[in-house]
């Protein structure tokens, strides 16, 4: 229930996938991955199809998963603002690591400017 609330998907359990918007489908897919409490969660364009409110909810849920269950979360994104919540930022260009740095100015998802 906490995960459903964080991802704003309460009430979607009884609906068919074709009845959900793209953003709702993405949030449900994220919940399906997170409910298993994985040791590693790979997220490619995690917030790509989401509005700002939903994006913040998803990022907060991922942060909670990381904090509570010590899940390693790898977020692949073109949204530089999201990197603000990372412990480590790795930039890749043309398949090669350009930089690999500890984020000394980490912020919470709610402090991000998306």
List the model feature ranges, each with a label.
Residues 41-44:
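Catalytic Walker B motif of ABC-type/P-loop ATPase nucleotide-binding domains
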Residues 30, 58:
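Hydrophobic anchor residue at the start of the ABC signature
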Residues 61-74:
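Conserved catalytic loops of ABC-family nucleotide-binding domains
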Residues 16-20, 24:
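Conserved ABC ATPase signature
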Residues 1-11:
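Conserved ABC ATPase "signature" region
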Residues 37:
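Conserved catalytic motifs of ABC-family nucleotide-binding domains
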Residues 52-54:
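Helix N-cap at the start of a conserved alpha-helix in ABC-type nucleotide-binding domains
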């Amino acid at each position: 229930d906490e995960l459903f609330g964080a991802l704003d998907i309460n009430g979607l359990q009884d609906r068919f996938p074709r009845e959900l918007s793209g953003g709702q489908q993405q949030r449900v897919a994220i919940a399906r991955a997170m409910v298993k409490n994985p040791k590693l969660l790979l997220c490619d364009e995690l917030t790509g199809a989401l509005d700002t409110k939903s994006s913040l909810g998803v990022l907060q849920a991922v942060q909670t998963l990381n904090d509570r269950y010590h899940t390693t979360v790898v977020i692949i994104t073109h949204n530089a603002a999201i990197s603000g919540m990372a412990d480590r930022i790795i930039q890749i260009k043309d398949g090669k690591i350009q930089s690999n740095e500890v984020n000394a100015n980490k912020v919470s998802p709610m402090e991000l400017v998306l």
